[in-house]
């Protein structure tokens, strides 16, 4: 009888440990979904948010935040340079089009297709659509996240082949280089 209780106790312990791992994975998946939704809700429709508010540490990785800050600073500096120039009617270097999406026009809708978590990184495949033109445009971008000591942060976005850049960091770096 004691062996039966011992076996039952060990079995219940192992089952409860496995259940916690599944719940932990589910909660990580939920946190990542929320982070990606926050990203596209705040920055997906317009580049105005980039210029009008500080880049949050809670959303972007330190590496991506640094590149974003450099690009914003370069753009604002060029805006001021043009204003003070002999030709203030010239167009300064500003972010044009949807910088966080493959399609210049941006998107009218998106859906998270999959989340792949491996150690401290995650890849989120996003299906986008732009239905304000005929035919409707569809494409897939991949959001890359890293799990920092402060939680999941967006580290890069790999663009679909319809985009004019390989990824977000490359696009921002090219932008900064064009201001020099």
What are these regions (language model features)?
Residues 18-20:
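Bacterial signal peptide processing site
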Residues 2-7:
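Sec-dependent signal peptide recognition
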Residues 119-140, 148, 155-180:
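Low-complexity, intrinsically disordered terminal/linker segments enriched in charged
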Residues 112-114, 141-147:
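Hydrophobic/aromatic beta-strand elements that line small-molecule binding cavities or substrate pockets
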Residues 13-16:
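C-terminal motif of bacterial Sec signal peptides marking the signal peptidase cleavage site
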Residues 61, 67-134:
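Surface-exposed, charged secondary-structure patches
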Residues 28-47:
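Short, aromatic-enriched amphipathic alpha-helices that serve as compact interaction elements
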């Amino acid at each position: 009888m004691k062996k039966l209780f011992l076996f039952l106790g060990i079995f219940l312990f192992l089952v409860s440990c496995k259940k916690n791992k599944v719940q932990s994975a589910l909660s990580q998946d939920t946190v990542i979904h929320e982070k990606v939704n926050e990203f596209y809700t705040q920055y997906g429709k317009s580049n105005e948010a980039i210029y009008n508010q500080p880049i949050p540490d809670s959303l972007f990785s330190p590496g991506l935040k640094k590149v974003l800050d450099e690009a914003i600073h370069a753009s604002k500096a060029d805006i001021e340079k043009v204003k003070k120039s002999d030709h203030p009617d010239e167009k300064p270097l500003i972010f044009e089009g949807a910088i966080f999406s493959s399609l210049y026009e941006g998107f009218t809708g998106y859906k998270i297709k999959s989340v792949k978590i491996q150690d401290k990184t995650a890849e989120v495949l996003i299906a986008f659509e732009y239905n304000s033109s005929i035919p409707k445009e569809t494409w897939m971008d991949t959001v890359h996240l890293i799990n920092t000591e402060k939680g999941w942060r967006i580290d890069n976005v790999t663009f679909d082949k319809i985009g004019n850049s390989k990824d977000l960091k490359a696009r921002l770096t090219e932008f900064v280089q064009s201001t020099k």
